[in-house]
Regions:
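Short beta-alpha connecting loops at secondary-structure transitions
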Residues: 22-29, 91
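C-terminal, non-catalytic "cap/extension" segments appended to globular domains
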Residues: 2-13, 17, 33, 37, ...
Length: 179
């Protein structure tokens, strides 16, 4: 996920006239993924704690969570599958790799830290990235972050900081000609 942000300078060569649209969409998608990924894990906790829930009750639980984690989503029946709270079923990780989405959320939060660094100093961001990746599997996740000068996603200030930076960038982005 982090390398996707490091590749932004080459987006023009790949996407051509749509590179600006890609950058906006990529950052917005990275930011909005975190609540979705969190919702997936929250839903699994409910289902595992209450295996007696009927399919209809599980759909209702998903709808409740969607209202909390994705309040911007319109689930008013345009697509019945989504409006009925059934769209958790399209998330194969729930069946194949339960509780895996937390990994994606953590990785995305770290990638947003790199994105924020890239906005200030690309060379410095790269040196932090190399410090992070060179350690490989030799340390715990939080040790990897600390040794590379990054903040753990478990700190509220981390998510708040990257979210505010991304929101400011998205709010100021010139959308002329790309919507």
């Amino acid at each position: 996920m982090s390398m996707e942000f490091f590749a932004w300078p080459w987006a023009d060569g790949f996407f051509g006239a749509d590179a600006r649209k890609f950058r906006y969409s990529h950052l917005a998608g990275a930011l909005t993924f975190i609540p979705y990924g969190t919702m997936v894990d929250h839903f699994q906790h409910i289902v595992y704690e209450h295996p007696e829930l009927t399919p209809a009750q599980r759909h209702e639980e998903w709808k409740k969570l969607a209202a909390i984690y994705q309040p911007w989503m319109r689930l008013d029946g345009e697509i019945p599958f989504y409006g009925a709270g059934e769209y958790w079923q399209r998330q194969m990780h729930i069946y194949q790799s339960p509780f895996y989405y937390i990994d994606y959320c953590l990785a995305q939060t770290v990638s947003l830290q790199f994105w924020a660094m890239l906005q200030k100093d690309r060379a410095d961001a790269w040196s932090h990235y190399m410090a992070y990746t060179k350690q490989g599997g030799s340390r715990t996740f939080t040790e990897l972050l600390k040794n590379a000068g990054l903040t753990t996603p478990f700190e509220e200030s981390c998510l708040r900081g990257v979210s505010e930076a991304a929101k400011a960038w998205l709010d100021s982005y010139d959308l002329t000609g790309i919507l």
